[in-house]
Amino acid sequence: MSEILELEAKSRNEFGTGAARALRREGRVPAIIYGAKKTPVSISLEEKEITKYYRKPAFISQLINLTIEGTQYKVLPKAVELHPVTDIVRHVDFVFLEDKTQKMEVPVVYEGKERALGVKRGGYFNIVKRRVTLLCDVNNIPRNVTIDVTNMPIATSLKSSKVKLPEGCSFTTKKEFVLATIIGRRGAKTEAEGEQTAEAAK
């Protein structure tokens, strides 16, 4: 199970644009928790703290223990609104963690893409999916999906059926999809094309 982040929050009872501006003047950010068939909870967070954590890798798949005036909630970030100029967090949506399984988006890490076999032979590594949606056991929530693509040849695609997911996780769709491809650049030949050319020359 991924490391759990501990955050403190305060409940809030005032809503609307004016109330949000007043919170931000105090250095706080409005937020809400919803989902899992529970009553939504409106809260506020310390702006500097939540912005600091947002800027760390894979925040959107970070499991969080959110303490609100003595009561703890296990939540996941769902959506983050940023200031258009400063990139400071302005609003956060969280979802309550489900009882058994959790649907969530996680980033995909393509390990070894710069030195992949197909790239060494002149190909270009093309990322189709930077994030994937998974259904995960709540006791084993991953921060990301890491795929070793070192041996991926040129002119091939990486399909979901070939990806080994973390234990307790599955894709939310059974339909096969492509996560990445290695595209041959002009002048680059696949191994099969090279063999055909050599055969024709005999």
From Swiss-Prot:
SUPFAM superfamilies with a match to the protein in the record: Ribosomal protein L25-like
GO molecular function (one): structural constituent of ribosome
A GO BP annotation: translation
Domain of life: Bacteria
Gene3D superfamilies: Ribosomal protein L25, beta domain, Ribosomal Protein L25, Chain P
Alphabetical UniProt keywords: Ribonucleoprotein, Ribosomal protein, RNA-binding, rRNA-binding
Cited InterPro entries: Rbsml_bL25/Gln-tRNA_synth_N, Ribosomal_bL25/Gln-tRNA_synth, Ribosomal_bL25_b-dom, Ribosomal_bL25_C, Ribosomal_bL25_long, Ribosomal_bL25_short, Ribosomal_L25_dom, Ribosomal_uL5_bac-type
Pfam families assigned to the protein according to its UniProt record, in alphabetical order: Ribosomal_L25p, Ribosomal_TL5_C
Gene Ontology cellular component terms for the protein in this record: cytosolic large ribosomal subunit
Transmembrane region(s): none
Family: Belongs to the bacterial ribosomal protein bL25 family. CTC subfamily.
Biological function: This is one of the proteins that binds to the 5S RNA in the ribosome where it forms part of the central protuberance.
Subunit record text: Part of the 50S ribosomal subunit; part of the 5S rRNA/L5/L18/L25 subcomplex. Contacts the 5S rRNA. Binds to the 5S rRNA independently of L5 and L18.
Entry-linked PANTHER family: RIBOSOMAL PROTEIN L25/GLN-TRNA SYNTHETASE, ANTI-CODON-BINDING DOMAIN-CONTAINING PROTEIN, RIBOSOMAL PROTEIN L25_GLN-TRNA SYNTHETASE, ANTI-CODON-BINDING DOMAIN-CONTAINING PROTEIN
NCBIfam families: bL25_bact_ctc, PRK05618.1-2, PRK05943.1
Name this polypeptide is given: Large ribosomal subunit protein bL25
Gene this protein is translated from: rplY
